């Protein structure tokens, strides 16, 4: 493997995957040398690459008949040879063997063939294009821009238009061009007549195409993206962006040899139905720039890395005949520096359009649009004839970006064709149009340009427009321009040829202002109309130094605004003050619609009102400004400068840097030219409006840039300024007195003022001053921005008065205010009928209080509003800005009542302090209006008012009279008093209810006392009653004293401060009863309440009685008891008993609930502990390898306070099972113990054993890793069930293979390798079934795992039966002889190729002679036949062994013929069968080398996996205990009797695998089975063998090894042997004489006797 091949592997793999994905292959290839060995994959790739031809049917037929892989590869190579490919160096054997060089050579041939096909297709389509067709009309409605272009030619290369086909891109990887299927893209051309471009992969520099640039980084100094979007075909919004350079503009000069030629750019029409999507046009708020590259000659790079990049340059020319080889200097054209701008635009390779149906006027062709490679390169483009280069733009604004929107321009006179394109804005680029490929589509696919004719390749300098054009702060749109003129043919209709390429640059930096007039055209917010380019009559436009962006007028703006602009009566704001405009929305677009701008006058250093108004217009794109209002603002512009000066003078006179309101009023009084406005007739609303507006404007003076909230440090004023300030302060006081008498301001409300209410969520930045249409009302309202911008609100005037923090304000909710929040148009004009406007004048220099204004005349209250809530208060800007509140303000008590009681609500004060639910923003909470007044001037005031009391001023100005002031306070107090009365009444009713209950009970006690008094009781009964009464008295006294302490601070009345003044004597006495009622709520006092209530009542009764007489003076009770009525006493006692019983039951229930809560809490803790342990196990599994230790070593330590079921999984498999049950992904792995040794799809649950769970494979996993994991899992399983390793099974050698669904895998066999990736096949529901070696492989691995017997033992038995043909299995009862015999018979039948019917089971009857004769005949017949069958004689009775011997004696012995015979007997003393009839005897021990342990462990592991329950560690100790107990039993049997009667392991195989269940089961087994059987065996042994020696009780051994720690001791639950009568005493044994002859005769008599087994 060479280095070059290694480098080419990923390239070829990617190439093959890309083409195979077009076919039916759903998964990608990973290893080409291995995957392409399959002829099916090779043929599929060939079918994708090679189109259908005359050899295809034969190739398909041959593939259908292929039977081997080599034949398929040979068929594929023959097919390629027929196609003309050189396959001489390729052989099928090399490909089949996975030779990398051969596979790479094959792929190289296919890629080369693919390139040839593309080249032929491209050349064919070039020939099909007609050069005389006429371009169909374009659908673009965008203005015709001009594009400053440059070009270089390549005349030195005569074959530049027919490039050579490059070699395969796989060998030298290039930037691939994705082939875009037009059917997938969804282009549905309607009237288009253009042929779609061919998909070219050549690397010629002479093939023309658009090439995109990389994305702009947003830096102003980096070239921005020139992009167009396919979605823009149906859009009429902004364009894709070309940003101008953020540097000083230079004057454009004519070059020495301006020799350029126009490139005809053809475009498709009706692209509106195209489904092509394009990248989003990024709208950036910053300046972007266009990187331009001077036109230089670029060498041919056809063989280079960028060979696949097709290039195109757009350029213009004056003289097409002349040429120059020298590069041209870089210059700026139009709005950007006149350089040879490279429009790096990408588009898909195919546009999917149909061939043209009409003739073109000149030679045009479709360009190859390629995928961009992120690099900047200069492009070469050939030049076409001179007649195609004559194109210019007739635009009214010198290459302005959106000049002429919605305006009709002359039709284009270009006859050859047009390039029309809709582009998309950044807002519409994220539409629902689907993009077929984000890699290939970076340009509108409708722009397809090509140049067919080979032209002289001489560098030509661009046509430089000799116009000094400065940098435009516009969205620049450039068009193609040429000064050459050509008359249009008469057949061309208007608007059919519109070479429009819309490119938008979000240039928002208003760097330069121009003094040249700019003609403004009125834009309309409708669908944009097309702007045609006329090439015939284009007069030279005057040079422009700068284009000033005008504000976008609103849709609601009447046309008179444009008239005013043209007449020069008003001046539009030309600059954003204090910040740089950072939006590229419709504001900038409309601004470019004007061609002239009147320069504004220079603003003052302190930011006059004119500048602030200009800022207002900049901040808002579509305000509700009327024409008359704008005219009035313009008229007032110069006059308000003087007010600004007064503002500064007033500001210097106050230490808090706040202006006094009187300065503005004085200024207004001194200027009578302002529409005859005077301050004498100013109403309260109007004067407050003027003062507030003055203060607000002073706020803008302090913060000219809106970027800092620090107030300016005031300078010390002179004496003249101080005196003037004091005089102005006096004017304020007198103006306020006039405001109280004027009602004019409350009567008029401007319609325009309604628009001051904005929708919630917008911030107010500056005031807006406008005059209504009738020029009678001037309105000031908040100026809110319709969209978010970078402006920050300036917070000023945050200087609070001393008592302002405690002031509040309430707002009323009216339908007018709510309507204003939704839309300003919903505010009715008749609101003045319901409200009389009032304003608050709060001079910022007043640092002690708040000035409130209120009109005197009575006003009709609003609906849903109390008469008291009638004052509208407006704050000065000194208060912090708040959001607008939907409620109106509510008037409160003036400041002079500040000493009212504490409980009265203090809701007066400043506007900012009174805003409880949020106030309006600054001074714009209400609409401010200035009305036209008379010429009366305000009188002068004395300077002494400065030292007057501001509190008195507030008290005199807040209300019209003292009567109204006190009436308002009385109304508030009356309302509060009414609330208190309601509270007192409700509490009194409650106390009366309690008193009624108390009276009722007292009546019952009184009645009881009367009965006692009237009754004549016996002395002893009277004494008993007296004792009871005394006892009740003591209890009641004690309870009363306790309740007195408990009632302190309790109850609602005790918390009321006015309890004594409103509560009655009865309510105060019944407070104890109220507290007793509260005690009834608690559970602990349930049942005691009634009793304590009764006892307190009895105590009070006895106290009243004791005041009059004591017990000695009580009348004696004598006489009969027949008149006593005990009903009431009995009822009371019964009620007490019921209460006590109910309390007792509740307490019991409470205890039960507490107990349940404790149980649940313990359960939760257990679950938490288990969850933590499971998480730890999961972490171990995910972090570490899947390994498993033995069962004993892996089970964690369980502490004493934990239960066994809280333990986590003890091994990996158990953890995985728990993880699977909890929803985690894992794969179940089973092993099949079928002795056949074949991988079968038949699932037998009895033969399936779960060995564990496998973790989900990863993307890096392969099938070898799966093999290793499965074998490791099986090895761990064997280590768990066979701890001693007695089975002798090798986990890695005993597994044949595994099956996954229909897929089979034989381990070690490469032919059965699964081609699919493991992650594609293995899921959480998949089961991997392993199969072990068996009879088919002449091995016994599956038989050993099924029987759990040692492998050597099984091999010996199989060898015996195959060689001897007759086998006897002898052993004790319960060892498993019958199952082993049947399994061996089945194994032999498979091993000898016999069917299952060949196994014959013969049961020998014990007593029935007729059946015995039938069995004898049948058995003899089978033995005499020569057919190979297997006979099973299971469990031969003890008295029929002679019968079996006689049957075999009658049949002669045949060595290699006859049936196989397997017999099972309970004893092995059968020498006749072994000696005379060639039987192989196999004696099975009762221990079976740990059979019990292996069987029970396998059961435990099986339950662990199936039930997903972890086995406790104590269970494995219990499993180890069973062989010890069984061995103790068998040792006792062997001592007292013979081995024949020992107990096999079957008795312990059915043990429950739980700790408690196994304990109870073993106790029952020992007491009910083992002890009786041992006693019987011992007695039979004494009779048979005379064994009466001493013995050891096995119960002692069992008690010593007892594994259960819970429960009683084993000595207490286990029975012991009762064999005292069998043990001889020492005295008797000494007297008895042993007779050996008698003993020998007895043994001989019972030699062949057997004892029945239990």
From Swiss-Prot:
Pfam families: AAA_lid_NAV1, Ubiquitin_6. Residues 162-174, 244-261, 595-607, 747-769, 779-799 have a biased composition (Polar residues). Residues 128-261, 274-364, 381-440, 480-501, 595-626, 650-680, 698-729, 747-799, 1059-1083 are annotated as: Disordered. One of its GO terms (molecular function) is actin filament binding. Disulfide bonds: none annotated. Residues 143-161, 197-243, 310-327, 407-429, 705-722, 1061-1083 have a biased composition (Low complexity). GO terms for cellular component: cytoplasm. Residues 962-994, 1152-1184 form a coiled coil. The keyword Acyltransferase does not apply. Residues 388-397 have a biased composition (Basic and acidic residues). Keywords: Calmodulin-binding, Coiled coil, Developmental protein. PROSITE patterns: CH. It comes from the Eukaryota. Residues 6-115 form the Calponin-homology (CH) domain. SUPFAM superfamilies: Calponin-homology domain, CH-domain, P-loop containing nucleoside triphosphate hydrolases. One of its GO terms (biological process) is mating behavior. Interacts with sem-5. Interacts with cmd-1 in the presence of Ca(2+). Belongs to the Nav/unc-53 family. Involved in the migration and outgrowth of muscles, axons and excretory canals. This is Adapter protein unc-53.
